[in-house]
């Protein structure tokens, strides 16, 4: 299954609690909570390029499944991690005590990030 495409955020759960837990300033949390960001994914075999645009903020991450990479987080911090592919529709990684699972089902992509007992879920639809 190919992840390639553009996806627009449809809904999210626990945005504010998760962003507070990772240390994002309140001002940025309030600015970001209603932005319907767009994610563009380009997949070439096991190589992925993610471009996430939320308002004026753009995050670009590139990685190859199973190889160590450096990813930029929502706070702008760069972390080293390894992204794994589970089945043919689920990307999984862990960094800084956060487990991130990105799952593709048809035209819907669900990103679930878990930090302790806080589960932040973003649901986006292919556009």
Curated annotation (Swiss-Prot):
Q: Give residue numbers for the modification (N6-succinyllysine).
A: 31, 36, 46, 57, 78, 90, 121
Q: Name one GO molecular function term.
A: antioxidant activity
InterPro entries, per the entry = Calycin, Fatty_acid-bd, ILBP
Any one Gene Ontology BP term: fatty acid transport
Q: Which domain of life is it from?
A: Eukaryota
Q: What is its main location?
A: cytoplasm
Instruction: Report the locations given in the UniProt record.
Output: Cytoplasm
On this chain, the residues bearing Phosphoserine are 11, 39, 56, 100
Q: Phosphothreonine: which positions carry it?
A: 51
GO CC annotation terms, alphabetical: cytosol; extracellular exosome; nucleoplasm; nucleus; peroxisomal matrix
Keyword Acetylation part of the UniProt annotation: yes
Keywords, in A-Z order: Acetylation, Cytoplasm, Lipid-binding, Phosphoprotein, Transport
Locate the N-acetylmethionine modifications and list their residues: 1
Return the similarity comment: Belongs to the calycin superfamily. Fatty-acid binding protein (FABP) family.
Record text about domains: Forms a beta-barrel structure that accommodates hydrophobic ligands in its interior.
Free-text function comment from the UniProt entry: Plays a role in lipoprotein-mediated cholesterol uptake in hepatocytes. Binds cholesterol. Binds free fatty acids and their coenzyme A derivatives, bilirubin, and some other small molecules in the cytoplasm. May be involved in intracellular lipid transport.
Q: Output this protein's name.
A: Fatty acid-binding protein, liver
Annotated gene: FABP1
